[in-house]
A protein has these predicted regions:
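Mid-domain alpha/beta scaffold segments of enzyme catalytic cores
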Residues: 1-283
Length: 283
């Protein structure tokens, strides 16, 4: 059973390049789905998401030759006041690198008060334009800025679509995003007992518009709370979503894997397949 972690931060999980590679290898070995270990799920592919120029440059250098590790590059709202020298030129250049499949994460974050709203909006729109120039999907960050984000995307709808990562809004908002060609991605917080709003959304929106992610090292699934989130833990989110949808894990995994390829405009020919069924080393 194969899984695509559509959003993780290897550079935030580990600065050490050896540890980054180990996290990838662990994910590709996977986790058992049941106590008897008769069923197994492996993270066959992942998207490493950057939040700033340094994050991309260092992590891309460390992992660019590893099969099935893809990258996006973008500057998150946290970088609005200090994006780096010549950031637009560098972004424009680096988006041509091999296995770079999207622009992100980009968006709006009014919770942390990065700059002011107008600064964030201008920063976001500039990167939407760059994504359009390169004909790439966008990976979206939204925190307490849902209406502004929706208004911007209505006027500047990405032609290659996008992913609203770590979804946190209601069902009505999800459908509005889906209408704009945006996939809805659920992270480990879907498994939290009190996340009833997310449970409702995940249970009811069309399966063909759903993705899963870890957002590693953040939002560790409930089964591993207290540990830093790692790509391998995405198995728990898959299992939880299967229960919400009342469907076999295997069937759901196949649908989500296909959705992930579509969201990032990848095909099976872009992947190298593995048959690793050894147990992962759980901490």
């Amino acid at each position: 059973m194969r899984i695509f972690d559509t959003h993780c931060h290897l550079g935030l999980l580990y600065e050490d390049p050896v540890s980054q590679v180990r996290a990838i290898d662990e994910a590709k070995r996977g986790l058992a789905l049941d106590k008897d270990k008769t069923k197994h799920a492996t993270v066959i592919a992942l998207a490493n998401i950057s939040t700033n120029l340094y994050d991309f440059a260092s992590c891309y250098k460390n992992t660019k030759n590893i099969p099935n590790v893809f990258h996006t590059i973008g500057l998150s709202p946290s970088e609005v006041m200090n994006p780096g020298k010549d950031w637009e030129e560098k972004l424009d250049e680096w988006l041509n690198y091999e296995n770079v499949i999207g622009v992100g994460e980009i968006g709006l974050d009014y919770h942390h008060k990065y700059g002011n709203k107008n600064d964030q909006i201008e920063f976001f729109i500039k990167q939407l334009d760059i994504a359009e120039k390169h004909e790439l999907p966008v990976v979206l960050h939204n925190r307490e800025a849902g209406e502004d984000m929706l208004d911007i995307l209505k006027s500047k709808t990405p032609s290659k679509g996008g992913i609203l990562h770590c979804f946190s809004e209601n069902s009505d908002y999800a459908y509005k995003m889906i209408d704009l060609g945006i996939y809805i991605s659920f992270a480990g917080n879907l498994t939290f007992h009190n996340a009833t709003n997310l449970h409702t959304v995940a249970r009811n929106i069309p399966l063909e518009n759903i993705l899963i992610e870890t957002d590693s090292p953040f939002l560790t699934p409930n089964a591993y709370r207290g540990k830093r989130n790692r790509p391998v833990f995405i198995v728990e989110t898959l299992k939880f979503l299967a229960k919400l949808r009342n469907m076999p894990v295997e069937k759901l995994a196949n649908i989500l894997f296909a959705n992930s390829l579509k969201a990032y405009h990848l095909s099976l020919s872009d992947l190298v397949y593995y048959d690793n069924t050894a147990e992962s080393d759980e901490e």
